[in-house]
Amino acid sequence: MTDEALSIYDEIEIEDMIFDPNLQIYHYPCPCGDRFEIAIDDLRDGEDIAVCPSCSLMIRVIFEVVCSLPASTRSRIWDADNVPYLQSDLPKDGNQPAPGAVSVQA
């Protein structure tokens, strides 16, 4: 569906949404009393529209995509200045990505 065909109620930063780790969804209160929902897998697929299951309202979720590198290129990574650094220099597994970032497979 094109943006022109969608009636977007609001645009919400992903930092303002609540993540449910059990259901793997982000949600945000809807004016109807229910909540807008979007699955983490939908975000990874590039979807940015959260819907309310109880009414016709939709919101656009504003987020930054962070790509995960294929296994063959993970040991060496280049920064913006084209300077390589090692995967071991990155934050350890227990650390979360930056607020507003959604990790996706490249």
UniProtKB/Swiss-Prot annotation:
Fe cation binds at residues 30, 32, 52, 55. It comes from the Eukaryota. It catalyses: [3Fe-4S](1+)-[protein] + Fe(2+)-[Dph3] = [3Fe-4S](0)-[protein] + Fe(3+)-[Dph3]; 2 [3Fe-4S](0)-[protein] + 2 Fe(2+)-[Dph3] + NADH = 2 [4Fe-4S](1+)-[protein] + 2 [Dph3] + NAD(+) + H(+). It is found in: Cytoplasm; Nucleus. InterPro entries: DPH3/4-like, DPH_MB_dom, DPH_MB_sf. GO terms for molecular function: ferrous iron binding; iron chaperone activity; oxidoreductase activity. Keywords: Cytoplasm, Iron, Metal-binding, Nucleus, Oxidoreductase. Its cofactor is Fe(2+). Residues 8-64 form the DPH-type MB domain. Pathway: Protein modification; peptidyl-diphthamide biosynthesis. SUPFAM superfamilies: CSL zinc finger. Pfam families: Zn_ribbon_CSL. GO terms for cellular component: cytoplasm; nucleus. GO terms for biological process: protein histidyl modification to diphthamide; tRNA wobble base 5-methoxycarbonylmethyl-2-thiouridinylation. Belongs to the DPH3 family. The DPH-type metal-binding (MB) domain can also bind zinc. However, iron is the physiological binding partner as zinc binding impairs the protein electron donor function. Required for the first step of diphthamide biosynthesis, a post-translational modification of histidine which occurs in elongation factor 2. Dph1 and dph2 transfer a 3-amino-3-carboxypropyl (ACP) group from S-adenosyl-L-methionine (SAM) to a histidine residue, the reaction is assisted by a reduction system comprising dph3 and a NADH-dependent reductase, predominantly cbr1. Acts as an electron donor to reduce the Fe-S cluster in dph1-dph2 keeping the [4Fe-4S] clusters in the active and reduced state. Component of the 2-(3-amino-3-carboxypropyl)histidine synthase complex composed of dph1, dph2, dph3 and a NADH-dependent reductase, predominantly cbr1. This is Diphthamide biosynthesis protein 3. The lineage of its organism: Eukaryota, Fungi, Dikarya, Ascomycota, Pezizomycotina. The gene is dph3.
